[in-house]
């Protein structure tokens, strides 16, 4: 007779089976949990090497010292503290075998307080926006991850530890609310919020039907859901006139601090997040979104409209002045912040008299009629400068006062042309120079090099010489007849490099290690009546060429076409090494120190290299310019690239340059890097060279000679800048570059 099991027995068996499965799951989770996911109840041993790599031992060394399987125990932690010599400083509660995540990271924080004296490990709450293999995109940037990628889920928050650009540990999950600061809200349609953040558009459900469009806001998340939206609707509209890392100066308003999480959005031709490079001083009407007295976002509602350039006026190559006085023949309106004062015509305006105001604000000086110029004066009011069109701005810094001339671009170019070339050069050469000056100025306005001082450029050879010579009818006409014309290559306005005199051939983009795609218009060309088949990259061929005057070259009658000098570094070792170190500070990638002439091992300093033993040309390109120069010393060697570095360094050894016309001139820098160097056997070096300037782009004297050959300005420009075209500047210029998407 078959026995029938009772229902009670079946239930008992099912219960026992379920309990067994549960126990197995717990055991598996305890030993294999890292493969299945993040746990608050334990820390996995193989998390520890990444967390402790900032200490005396590397990540690999920690992996050897600690078992890497299973979960972390209090015994493990005790061993870690002993290895770190912290056991007597950090007490342990060893009541349980395994240590949970919160307890371990409390101990880890204490370890950091003792050992991480440089604060290299940072603690941060992140919100995961995107996960790709071993990389997380978060509200604050992109980080590599060392733990299991399965731990991280999109739109969840994590308390993490960061070392450089890596997440090295996870202390908690969904414990803190995290906000996307200064996101751009596009729309809220039927509870679906569309917003832009870090270059990526997101669409998420939101528990509200309120209007949320075209506004900047903080979006707070809690456990994967939006739980709060804080709109930021206070704005200031105006022009940006100076910018530092911490503040922006708005014309007619003053300085405003910058939120660390500030975003920039272009809202014309679609909505996109753009980089800081999109901002141009003076020439953009900008909407600044402000919250808690900080700029938290910038809205670019239209492209830049090029009107004015801001020129820092130097005082004998010094940007700072102990004091300065200006005057105009008409009443002057003086602006600072939102305040306006009118001064009588002829009033001497001295910066030190406004020191109290300048301590917190710039001061803008505007002629009442909008056209009368300003002049610098001495202490007695005597005029000591040419006339300056436009307005003036005064600022005060710990080093002294600065003066910025805000002037329309055409007036600026009119001030550049006579300062760069004589009006006798011929109209077509002057017009070519005007197009170059205008194009070059635009590029510098994009670069904003002097933005911290409220300027785009200065008035020296650092950029373009400005207002150092009086304008003439010819130079003014050259600017007027080319008004608004700039050179473009592949649709972009180009940087129109120019210089004084060629040696018969111009340089190309390779001389400065420039990108061929962007600077392909800088091709080396012969500046002579016909091509010459000589290979100028060959040392012997170059020496043969530079040793003679090539009469077929347009500039062969000019004194800088050929020159010679002697390099003598005896007694100048300290000066030479100091100059090398200075140039490396300015351009570190172009100069390299080696322990010896074999150049197999680098070193960080050249200060103990001793005296110079030899100079060698390592590489020369087809235009003839030296690409790499090697200087061998008693205790090391130096590799030098870039023509200006070579000219400055070798310039330490010269006194006079002997020119083609028989004259001699004192110089402290070589006229060009189109040179041949020959050791003389007595420790000195004979140098044969040609040309004056960097040699890249347009030769100004070459342009004059081409003008004399009947070339018009368009043909001159196409001669020196290959595959370019004239375009119109005074139309809206799109300066924006879209930020990389998440």
Residue ranges and their predicted role:
Residues 94-98:
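Serine/threonine-rich, repeat-prone extracellular segments and beta-strand-based repeat modules
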Residues 2-42, 46-47, 51, 56-67, ...:
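Conserved, single-site charged/polar hotspot
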Residues 77-80, 702:
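Residues within well-ordered alpha-helices
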